[in-house]
Amino acid sequence: MTVRDGTEQRRRVVVVEDDEDIAELLTDILDAEGFAPVAVSDAAGLDRELGQRPDLIVLDLRLTRGGADKIMSSLRSRGLGDVPILLLSAASDLPDRAKELGVTSFLAKPFELEDFIVLVRRLL
C-alpha cells in the first residue's frame, strides 16, 4: 500500500456495484491507496454522482438495476465517453462484453486486490 502525505489531489473513482460487501471492500481499498472513492448501486446513483466528473468508473457488468449497457449509453450521451471504465464480472463472456461495451479495461471476478489496484493506477 502507498502512504500519501495529503498534499496532492485525490483522484475520484466511482464504483458502480450492487453487492454492498464488494462495494465496501473496493471503496475501502481505494481509500487506503489514496483515491477518493464513492460507491453507488445503480445507474440512477451514478447519474447523481456525475455532477463532479470522475477520473475513473469501476463498473459491475451484471447490475440488477440499470445495467452496464444503459450506463455506457448514458455516459456517452453526457460527453463522458473519455472517462476510463474498468468493467468487473465473473461472467464467462467478459472479454466479449467488454469489447461490445467499449470499456477501457476489464477484470474477472474473483480477483486479487493487488491486481485491482495495479490496474486502477494504470488506467489513471
Where is each model-derived feature located?
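Conserved acidic carboxylate
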Residues: 17, 89
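Conserved phosphotransfer microenvironments
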Residues: 60-74
